[in-house]
Amino acid sequence: MLAKRIIPCLDVTGGRVVKGVNFLELRDAGDPVEIAARYNAQGADELTFLDITATSDGRDLILPIIEAVASQVFIPLTVGGGVRTVADVRRLLNAGADKTSFNSAAIADPQVINDASQKYGSQCIVVAIDAKRRSPEEAATRGAGWDVYSHGGRKNTGLDAVEWATEMVRRGAGEILLTSMDRDGTKSGFDLALTRAVSDAVNVPVIASGGVGSLDDLADGIQTGGADAVLAASIFHYGEHTVGEAKARMAARGIPVRT
């Protein structure tokens, strides 16, 4: 079995790292460059940087901050938020990103995933999916499952999350970053049923995101959810745990990690 990755996530707005609950109630967590350097030193396998209001605000990519973060980080860096075009991929790669993450733009124009992966290779094209479990009323008419939300979780697209992940991989996505909006920031653990459903449906790595409150939650995402990597923010940002502690817990549970 390949080593499983632990990926701290920097949600950035206004040039600061923030963390919310269910995509709302944002709380300041610090300077992105300082935090990125800390995770690099702690032995994180990768880092994900998401400009969480770029799309909803209609803003351009914040290249100076991305360049500053990339200069401090010597592990793979994924950048998302406001990535709209194939040209944006080139700009981010030039700024120091290793992978770029599409979300709302892929929903508006799925062909961008074909075009970007053909030009730069699927290994650097990630599709982020923000998914929310259907309400009992919706499930009664459409069946149980999860819908895809766009614009920072503000808009229900009506797309089924598992079907959307499958289509994105078919179009060339090399990785799926799967966030449970229901669990985001709640510290109640991943939505393991969602993680498992998508992991079983696609043949590329799935990164589980949304809800980590303990080190065992990370291991559960791999062992029960079937994820290839686990992403967390709150438990790392506020000093509750280090990446090293997370790797030690995963190793103790029999999960291969990079040491």
Swiss-Prot record:
Record-level Gene Ontology MF annotations: imidazoleglycerol-phosphate synthase activity; lyase activity
One Pfam family matching this protein: His_biosynth
Alphabetical list of Gene3D superfamilies matching this protein: Aldolase class I
Localization terms from the record: Cytoplasm
Catalytic activity: 5-[(5-phospho-1-deoxy-D-ribulos-1-ylimino)methylamino]-1-(5-phospho-beta-D-ribosyl)imidazole-4-carboxamide + L-glutamine = D-erythro-1-(imidazol-4-yl)glycerol 3-phosphate + 5-amino-1-(5-phospho-beta-D-ribosyl)imidazole-4-carboxamide + L-glutamate + H(+)
Active site: 11, 130
Class of enzymatic activity (EC top level): lyase
Protein's pathway: Amino-acid biosynthesis; L-histidine biosynthesis; L-histidine from 5-phospho-alpha-D-ribose 1-diphosphate: step 5/9
Keywords of the record: Amino-acid biosynthesis, Cytoplasm, Histidine biosynthesis, Lyase
GO biological process, one term: L-histidine biosynthetic process
GO cellular component, one term: cytoplasm
EC number: 4.3.2.10
Recorded coiled-coil stretches: none
Superkingdom of this protein's organism: Bacteria
Function field: IGPS catalyzes the conversion of PRFAR and glutamine to IGP, AICAR and glutamate. The HisF subunit catalyzes the cyclization activity that produces IGP and AICAR from PRFAR using the ammonia provided by the HisH subunit.
Similarity field: Belongs to the HisA/HisF family.
Binding partners and assembly: Heterodimer of HisH and HisF.
Protein name: Imidazole glycerol phosphate synthase subunit HisF
Gene (name only): hisF
